[in-house]
Amino acid sequence: MSDSDLEAFRAETREWLEANCPPEMREPVRDEGDVYWGGRNASFKSDAQKAWFEACRDKGYTVPEWPKAYGGAGLTPPEGKILRQEMARINARPPLSSFGIWMLGPALLHFGTEGQKQKFLNEIARGEIRWCQGYSEPGSGSDLVSMQTFGEDKGDHWVVNGQKIWTSYADEADWIFCLVRTDKENKYQGITFMLFDMENEGVSTKPIKLISGNSPFCETFMDDVTVPKSYGEDIPGYVGEINRGWDVAKYLLGHEREMISATGGGDRASSLGAVTSRAGLLDPVLRAEMAMFDVDALSFTAMSEKFMDELKARIEAPLVTHLHA
C-alpha cells in the first residue's frame, strides 16, 4: 500500500473508533473484569463492554490481521500497526483477550488444516471458546520435554493421564491445547500437540492461591481422559503431526513474545510517558516518579523481548519454564 493509502486508512480507522468505542472503554484497565475474555459461560461487565466487543467482532477487529475467512479483518501488517496506534491514542481497551488469539491462533494459521482453521479460528475470533495452555508439569522444571503426561493410543483416540501446573485460568477455560507424550522412546519427537474440551470426563482443575490472594493459575489433572483423533472431516484433534508437537510448541513460542510485549509495554503512545504530559500532573515530584516508572516499563519490555529472542534461539534445547504456562 502507498503512503497515501495508509493515511486514508488511518483517517477511516480514527473515524470508526470515534463512532464505535464507548467512552467507558477508553479508561485504564484496573482488573481482569475490565477486559472481556469470551467463552461459553462468559458475561459482560457492562453494556459498553458488550457494545465494544460486538462492534470489533463484526468488523473483524478482535483479530484484525487474520484472514476474513477465519473471523479477522484481513489487514496488512502496516494497517494492523495503524489500528493499534489509533486504539492506543484513545486508550481503547482490548475488545477481547484470549490465549486463543495470542498463542493457539498463530499455530493453527501455520500448522492447522483448513477444517481446523474454519472451526477453531472463527470460534476464537467470535469469543465463543476460551482456551488455556497445558505445558508445564510439576516434575518437569526447566526441562519441558521431560513431561510425563502420556496419551495411550487406542486407535481412533488417545487415553490421556497426567498433570499440568501453572495453567493460566484453566478453571475458566473451555478447551485446552496441551503437550502430551505419545512416544516414550523419543524425547523430542514423541510429543503431540493435542486439543480437547475441558468438560471431557476425567479433566479437573485446582486453583493455586498466590500470596496476593489471587488464583490466576491452576493445577490441571487428566485421569483417563478420552481425546479424539478427529472432531470431524479435516478437523484433527491435534495440531501438526502426531509425535511432532514439539515443532508446533517451538513455533508458538515465537508468538509469546508478542503477547509479553503487548502486556509489558505495548505501543509507546499508551505508555506512562504520554500520561506525564497531561495538564493534571503539575507536581514535579509526581512527574519525575512517573517518568521513572515509565523507564522501568520500557526496560521490562526490552528485557522481555531479549529473553524471548534468546529462548527462541535454543531450538533443540530444553525450554525454561514459560511465563504463561
Please provide the spans of the model-predicted regions.
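A structural signal for short hydrophobic beta-strand segments in well-ordered beta-sheet cores
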Residues: 149-152
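A short core secondary-structure module
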Residues: 156-157, 161-206
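Short Ser/Thr-interspersed hydrophobic loop/turn segments at strand-loop and sheet-helix junctions
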Residues: 60, 83-88, 179-180, 195-201, ...
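A short, Trp-centered hydrophobic/proline-enriched beta-strand micro-motif
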Residues: 127-135
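N-terminal glycine-rich flavin-associated loop
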Residues: 96-115, 141
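C-terminal helix-coil-helix/basic helical segment that borders enzyme active sites and/or dimer interfaces
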Residues: 27-30, 284-287, 298-325
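Glycine-rich beta->alpha junctions and the first turn(s) of the following alpha-helix
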Residues: 9, 202-303, 321
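Amphipathic, small/basic residue-rich leader segments at the start of a protein or domain
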Residues: 1-98, 118-126, 286-291, 298
